[in-house]
């Protein structure tokens, strides 16, 4: 492919509105352009990468018997009313009317559509299982689109749905998908973890998220690629190294989610779902009597603890939530933080939000800062974190402004439902007892759910089982964020390329180091002087030879300065660069391996053989 024929609008500078490196490089390297807020055009390079990823997916899904189809993006609202999600999905749902004033939506996901198609066509367990998927644009009216392709209003997604006559059959397909996802992301060159996830708006029960890890840019050996003009990092002057570190740190670490994972086992979970090892403790101290004490101007746990000279771990944090229009009191040990996802899941609530100051006063008779679990109205629902039951003679709010109660003992002074509703902390023991928890940022690239009968129940999708009984179809759901794969790969494979000029100056610039499976082309073939006929002829021969051996070749045939050509090549990030330069008449070309910065000169006749050796090594 001739570069002069492609739309690759590279920029000399990073875009000023980009906060994460993947967004900046996709724009600067000419992969994407923003058409409107949260809406992007995928230019030829991006489209080629996405198509390569689609090929990987299709190959792996064929192995597990998944069949591709295509559903409409424009959906009737009636289907979503059947499932109940038309009213509950929220403001992210694009709603519109046609000329007949009928309600439609732009699909953010397609559970209802696939359920309806199968409901109308499948009547017996003998017709199951079915394993269907599509690759299609989705739509979500994000309030604040950001970070390039990571949070957009239109995005490309692979969504799959499986249909079964029982849960045992679903378990088999779920495991097939889990293994297929691992194979897909491994082939794509991603550093990822499969973690325990939250079913969220999909209504799933068991679920697993696949997160592309976005580590901090502190490891110079990982993020910096040295040109052959620099022997090692030790040769770079200290002041230049400090500049490089500052440049690496200047870009925000992307990833919407925090992952908690064990240092010594396979345990990994989204922070929203992560738990830690818990060991109940026996009470050894005698229980004191309740005593009300004045705590003037103390509104926070640390202020109360300091005023009463107690540790924060001896205090009870009392919070009030409204769950599906019902008040729920949540209790934590004072130095812990609430995990609202755990609380919402435990309550099986559709809606959960913190109560207002006015609602707190109506319920407790006091404002925030003085709330507590003692002497609440009969029938009040109290959900306490499991650590609270270990407390003896704790401090809690007195439900009276400016006062607290000491000597509070769970069981004696209040009754509660005990469950894990706290946010874990880094360094705590893993729940399996092996290793401690560490945190990392991650980009969600895939998610699989066991939906069960959530949609078949609400939409009447039933079959006759082997005993002739009418039973709901059991479902699974499997998603991959196709467009955000591009962002995730660039986040992990962006590199700062450093070289030394003949004058001894050090220069550095960002570029992409694409893994071979997803690179838009395999080889960047550059002619230094397009007016040199010998070089042109050699380039044409090499292009033909490479293509005959199955290489995708991008040939830079532009009449541009060689510096511009090399800069664009570093930005675009193809794995191999072959330069036809001053030694073209001698039949000598230069090969450069992007991942390492290594380069060698070879006879053009030996190019293919040399590339085969080098690509095996790297």
Swiss-Prot record:
Keyword match Iron: no
Paired cysteines (S-S): none
GO cellular component, as recorded: cytosol
Keyword terms, alphabetized: Aminoacyl-tRNA synthetase, ATP-binding, Cytoplasm, Ligase, Nucleotide-binding, Protein biosynthesis
Record's subunit section: Homodimer.
The name this protein goes by in its record: Proline--tRNA ligase
UniProt organism field: Streptococcus pyogenes serotype M49 (strain NZ131)
UniProt entry tagged with the keyword Nucleotide-binding: yes
PROSITE patterns: AA_TRNA_LIGASE_II
Lineage: Bacteria, Bacillati, Bacillota, Bacilli, Lactobacillales
Coiled coil: none
GO molecular function annotations of the record: aminoacyl-tRNA deacylase activity; ATP binding; catalytic activity, acting on a protein; proline-tRNA ligase activity; transferase activity
């Amino acid at each position: 492919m001739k570069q002069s024929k492609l739309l690759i609008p590279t920029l000399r500078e990073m875009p000023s509105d980009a906060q994460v490196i993947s967004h900046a490089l996709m724009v600067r390297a000419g992969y994407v352009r923003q058409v409107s807020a949260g809406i992007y055009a995928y230019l030829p390079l991006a489209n080629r990468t996405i198509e390569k990823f689609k090929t990987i997916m299709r190959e792996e899904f064929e192995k597990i018997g998944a069949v591709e189809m295509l559903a409409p993006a424009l959906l009737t609202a009636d289907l979503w009313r059947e499932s109940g999600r038309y009213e509950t999905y929220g403001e992210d749902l694009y709603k519109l009317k046609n000329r007949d004033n009928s309600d439609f939506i732009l699909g953010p996901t397609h559970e209802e559509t696939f359920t309806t198609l199968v409901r109308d066509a499948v009547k017996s367990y003998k017709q199951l299982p079915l394993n269907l998927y599509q690759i299609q644009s989705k739509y979500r009216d994000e309030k604040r689109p950001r970070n390039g392709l990571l949070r957009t209003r239109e995005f490309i997604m692979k969504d799959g749905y499986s249909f079964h006559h029982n849960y045992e059959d679903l378990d088999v397909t779920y495991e097939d998908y889990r293994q297929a996802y691992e194979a897909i992301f491994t082939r794509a060159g991603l550093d990822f973890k499969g973690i325990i996830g939250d079913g969220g708006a999909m209504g799933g029960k068991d679920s697993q998220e696949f997160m592309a890890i976005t580590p901090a840019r502190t490891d110079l050996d990982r993020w910096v690629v040295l040109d052959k003009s620099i022997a090692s990092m030790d040769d770079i002057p200290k002041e230049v190294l400090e500049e490089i570190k500052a440049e690496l740190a200047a870009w925000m670490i992307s990833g919407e989610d925090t992952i908690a994972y064990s240092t010594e086992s396979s345990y990994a979970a989204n922070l929203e779902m992560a738990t830690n090892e818990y060991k109940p403790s026996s009470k050894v101290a005698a229980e004191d009597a309740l005593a009300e004490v004045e705590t003037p101007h103390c509104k926070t746990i640390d202020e109360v603890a300091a005023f009463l000279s107690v540790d924060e771990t001896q205090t009870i944090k009392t919070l009030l939530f409204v769950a599906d229009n019902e008040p729920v009191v949540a209790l934590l040990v004072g130095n812990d933080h609430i995990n609202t996802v755990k609380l919402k899941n435990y309550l099986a609530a559709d809606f959960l939000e913190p109560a207002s100051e006015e609602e707190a006063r109506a319920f407790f008779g006091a404002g925030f800062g003085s709330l507590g679990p003692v002497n609440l109205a009969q029938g009040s629902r109290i959900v306490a974190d499991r650590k609270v039951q270990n407390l003896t003679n704790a401090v809690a709010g007195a439900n009276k402004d400016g006062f607290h109660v000491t000597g509070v003992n769970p069981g004696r002074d209040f009754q509660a439902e005990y469950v894990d509703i706290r946010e874990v902390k880094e360094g705590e023991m893993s729940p399996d007892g092996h290793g401690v928890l560490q945190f990392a940022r991650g980009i969600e690239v895939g998610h699989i759910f066991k939906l069960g009968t959530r949609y078949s129940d609400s939409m009447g999708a039933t079959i006759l089982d082997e005993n002739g009984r009418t039973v709901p179809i059991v479902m699974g759901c499997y998603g991959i964020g196709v467009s955000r794969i591009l962002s995730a790969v660039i986040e992990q494979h962006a590199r700062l390329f450093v070289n030394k000029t003949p004058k001894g100056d050090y220069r550095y610039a960002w570029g992409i180091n694409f893994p071979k499976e997803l690179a838009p082309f395999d080889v960047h073939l550059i002619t230094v002087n397009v007016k040199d006929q010998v070089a042109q002829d050699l380039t044409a021969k090499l292009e033909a030879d490479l293509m005959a051996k199955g290489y995708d070749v991008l040939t830079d045939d532009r009449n541009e300065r060689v510096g511009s050509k090399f800069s664009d090549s570093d930005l675009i990030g193809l794995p191999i660069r072959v330069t036809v330069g001053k030694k073209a008449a001698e039949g000598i070309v230069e090969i450069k391996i992007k991942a390492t910065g290594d380069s060698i000169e070879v006879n053009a006749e030996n190019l293919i053989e040399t590339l085969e050796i080098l690509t095996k090594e790297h």
